C-alpha cells in the first residue's frame, strides 16, 4: 500500500468516546483538559458532544454532569488552533440545539443516522448548511448496507440536502479492509469530486488501523480516531498509533507524534475507569456486527439475568438490531433467561 505524499485530516473523538468507560460523569475540568492538551499536537478538529449528541440528556444512558452549552462555552474559547465539531441525531437534537452549538463556536456538525435511513436527516443537514457550518452526513452501521446501496444513500444526502462530507461509519467494528475499500470506492465514484469522504472505525476485530488505512487509500480524506483508543466496545482507531503508522508510510497528518503519544499516556489513560481492549465481549460485537454502544448494556443485562453478554450480543446481531434499540437488550436478556430456566426444569 503506497500512500507516500498523501495528506489526511484526523479528527479526535475522545470526549464523545469518554462517555463509554465513564458514562456521563465527565466534569467541566476534564472536558477542558483534554481538548486544550490536544490543541498542542495540532489536532485539527475535536468532537465535544454528549453520548447522544446535542440535546442528548437521556434516561437511556445517564444524565450528564453538565449540559451541552456549558461544556462548549467552557472549552471553545480556550482552543488556539483546533476547531470543534458536535454530533446531532435527528429525533434527539433540534434546530434550537444546532443554533446554540453554532453560537458557541462549533464549526462542524455531524448529522448521524442509520446508514439506510439518511432521509430523516434532510432538515438537519439543510439547516446546518444554510447556517454556514461544515456539515457531515454520518452514515452509521455501514456494514449493513447491501452492495450498491451506500452510494444511493449518500447521493440522497449530498444532492438533496447539501452535506459537504459523507462518512462511512463502521459502528460495529465488523468490516475488513477489502470491505472498507469497496464501500469508500463506491462513494468516491458516485459523489461530486468536491464532496469529501470520511471513515470512522472501531477496533472490535483489531482492524481499526488497517481499515482506516484502507479507507484513506480508497479516497477518504477525513479519518476519525481517539487518543488511547477511547470508544465503545474495544474503542475507536487509536490516534497516536495511527499517526505513527502514517509517519512510517509518508502520509502527512500535521500532528506532532510525540505530543499526542504523551496526551494518551499521561492524561487520557489515567482518566479511564477500565481498560479498553479486545476482550471476548468486544470481539463478539465485531464478529456479530453489533452496534458497539450495546456492549455495556449487554454486560449489565448479564449481571441482572445471568445470561452471558456474548450470547446476548450474538442474538442481537442475528436479529439485525441497530443503534437506538437499546431497550431491546433488556427484553432479550429476560426472554433468554426464562428460556434457559425452562430448559433446566424440563431436563
Curated annotation (Swiss-Prot):
**Gene Ontology biological process terms from the UniProt entry:** catabolic process; L-leucine biosynthetic process
> What range(s) does the Pyruvate carboxyltransferase domain occupy?
8-261
A GO molecular function held by the record:
2-isopropylmalate synthase activity
Question: What Gene3D superfamilies is this protein classified in?
Answer: 1.10.8.60, Aldolase class I (3.20.20.70)
Task: Alphabetically list the UniProt keywords.
Answer: Aromatic hydrocarbons catabolism, Lyase, Manganese, Metal-binding
| Enzyme Commission designation | 4.1.3.39
Q: Which Pfam families match?
A: DmpG_comm (PF07836), HMGL-like (PF00682)
Q: Which residues form the active site?
A: 20
UniProt binding sites for substrate: 171, 200, 291
Q: Which reaction does it catalyse?
A: (S)-4-hydroxy-2-oxopentanoate = acetaldehyde + pyruvate
SUPFAM superfamilies membership: Aldolase, post-HMGL domain-like
Q: Which PROSITE patterns match?
A: PYR_CT
- Listed binding positions for Mn(2+) are 200, 202
Give the family from UniProt. Belongs to the 4-hydroxy-2-oxovalerate aldolase family.
Protein name stated in the entry: 4-hydroxy-2-oxovalerate aldolase 1
Q: Which gene carries the instructions for this protein?
A: salH
Amino acid at each position: 500500500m503506497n500512500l507516500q505524499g498523501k495528506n489526511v485530516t484526523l479528527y479526535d473523538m475522545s470526549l464523545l468516546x469518554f462517555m463509554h468507560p465513564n458514562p456521563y460523569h465527565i466534569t467541566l475540568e476534564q472536558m477542558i483538559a483534554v481538548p486544550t492538551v490536544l490543541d498542542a499536537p495540532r489536532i485539527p478538529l475535536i468532537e465535544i458532544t454528549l453520548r447522544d449528541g446535542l440535546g442528548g440528556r437521556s434516561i437511556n444512558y445517564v444524565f450528564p454532569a453538565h449540559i451541552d452549552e456549558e461544556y462548549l462555552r467552557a472549552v471553545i474559547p480556550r482552543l488556539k488552533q483546533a476547531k470543534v465539531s458536535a454530533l446531532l441525531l435527528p429525533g434527539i437534537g433540534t434546530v434550537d440545539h444546532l443554533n446554540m452549538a453554532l453560537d458557541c463556536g462549533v464549526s462542524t456538525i455531524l448529522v448521524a443516522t442509520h446508514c439506510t435511513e439518511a432521509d430523516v436527516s434532510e432538515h438537519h443537514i439543510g439547516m446546518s448548511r444554510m447556517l454556514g457550518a461544515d456539515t457531515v452526513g454520518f452514515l452509521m452501521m455501514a456494514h449493513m448496507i447491501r452492495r450498491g446501496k451506500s452510494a444511493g444513500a449518500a447521493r440522497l444526502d449530498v444532492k438533496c440536502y447539501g452535506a459537504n462530507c459523507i462518512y462511512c461509519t463502521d459502528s460495529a467494528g465488523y468490516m475488513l479492509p477489502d470491505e472498507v475499500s469497496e464501500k469508500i470506492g463506491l462513494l468516491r465514484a458516485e459523489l461530486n469530486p468536491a464532496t469529501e469522504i470520511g471513515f470512522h472505525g472501531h477496533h472490535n476485530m483489531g482492524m481499526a488501523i488497517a481499515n482506516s488505512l484502507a479507507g484513506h487509500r480508497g479516497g477518504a480524506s477525513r479519518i476519525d480516531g481517539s487518543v488511547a483508543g477511547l470508544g465503545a466496545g474495544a474503542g475507536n482507531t487509536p490516534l497516536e498509533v495511527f499517526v505513527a503508522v502514517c509517519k512510517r508510510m509518508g502520509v502527512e497528518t500535521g500532528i506532532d507524534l510525540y505530543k499526542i503519544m504523551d496526551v494518551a499516556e499521561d492524561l487520557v489513560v489515567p482518566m479511564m475507569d477500565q481498560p479498553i481492549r479486545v476482550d471476548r465481549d468486544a470481539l463478539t460485537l465485531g464478529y456479530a456486527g453489533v452496534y458497539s454502544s450495546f456492549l455495556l448494556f449487554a454486560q449489565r443485562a448479564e449481571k441482572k439475568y445471568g445470561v452471558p453478554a456474548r450470547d446476548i450480543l450474538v442474538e442481537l446481531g442475528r436479529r439485525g438490531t441497530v443503534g437506538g434499540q437499546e431497550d431491546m437488550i433488556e427484553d432479550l436478556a429476560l426472554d433468554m433467561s426464562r428460556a434457559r430456566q425452562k430448559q433446566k426444569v424440563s431436563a
